[in-house]
Structure formats: structure tokens, C-alpha cells
């Protein structure tokens, strides 16, 4: 299928890259929606293996941010976990010649219509149960939502999960929210700690057994695409929200 050419979205305001676990970095940036005109935060996770860097849930960085990223190592791979993310993946592929990995069944469409005809990027790898991932200690936990989503499970630091839209940890709004998002998103159920993503749950309709199956994973830390990192006892902190899914 021919790709629809489009310019890379610009770098939007973001914070500093910070190491939340040895070899695992986290940076909070911005996403901007047109209708309704909401602006709120999103996170990128940077996982280091030797001198290689794997970016998960990409957020485009500004010039200073890219210099800080380059100081950490060489970007070789980009991993997309949530179908609602990925708009900055083409930028990192072009800049670093990075290999792009997505969950099988996802497509790069503009906006939130996963079934739209036009796509703006084709991945290098569509990840399934038997896919050898770009991190030697990683595996994928796939959720059969529509479109599908996955968790990246790292066998390090007593188990570390990187999440897309399914698990969120917005205990409060932050500096990247505009006034409308500060008003609307609490009412919509987003601003809660240790939360199952409410819009994702409603729109993507994951099987409850797949969501509850997350509790069968062994992890102490959770790095979400939205909200603060949870370092220590993460599975138990998310247990109540996951068990409420029906």
C-alpha cells in the first residue's frame, strides 16, 4: 500500500531525560489533540543494552534533548506498544536509521481511526508471540484488543513492564496539560493513580481475561506512556484497578 507522505510533527515541550532504573531512562513530553483541543503529557522509555538504545513509546525531543539522548548510546530500534501512539516513530527512523517494531495488527494511521485507508509508515517488524525482540531480556505480553496492544516485559530490576495506553498512572495533572485537559480529563476518569486507561478500555474492548492476565506477570516496576513511573511494588498497586475490569 502506498504511504501518505507527511511532515514530521515538531518537537513539543518536554522534560529532561532521567534514569529511573539502572540502564532505563524516562522522559515526559507533550501530545496535542485538535478536536477537542487538548494538550497533555506522554512518556518515552529508553532502554540501554550495551551501547545500543531502544526507544519505546517515542516522543520527539528537541535539539538539546537529542544531544542528551546521543550521549547515552546509539539509537538502533523503536518499539510501539499502543496503536494510539507512534507519530514520532518516522522521525527516529529517519534520523537514526532505526528499525521500527509494532504489535502485529497495528497500523500507522492519522488520528484515532485504526481502520483508515491511508497509512504514513510501514514497520520493519510486526511483533507476535515468537518474535525475537531487540532486547535480550525482553518478552511481549499481547492484549487482544481492537487494535491490539502489548506490554514490554523486561527481566531486570525484579521485573519491569513498559506500558502503552492500557496501564496509566496520572495521580494528578502536570505542567504539560492545558486548561481544558485539566478540566475535562479528571471527569473522563483519566486522573487516577494506578489506573487502567479508560478511553482505551472503552474504545478497544480488550478481553477481560487478557487484562486480568497482567497480574500473572512478575514485575515490580511499571513505566507507563501516561503518568509517573511506578518503581517498586507496581503489580500490587495496579491490582485493584485490573481486578475491576469486567
Please identify what each model-predicted range represents:
Residues 1-64, 115-185, 209-216:
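Catalytic core of the metallo-beta-lactamase
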Residues 26-29, 71, 193:
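Generic signal for short, ordered secondary-structure residues
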Residues 47, 67-69, 189-191:
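A short alpha-helix capping/helix-coil boundary motif
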Residues 50-53, 70-76, 219:
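Short, surface-exposed connector motifs at secondary-structure boundaries
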Residues 56-59, 79-83, 103-104, 143, ...:
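Short His-Asn-centered micro-motif
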Residues 66-132:
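Active-site HxH/HxHxD metal-binding segment of metal-dependent hydrolases
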Residues 87-88, 109-112, 147-149, 169-172, ...:
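Short, well-ordered, mixed-charge alpha-helical segments that flank or form enzyme active sites
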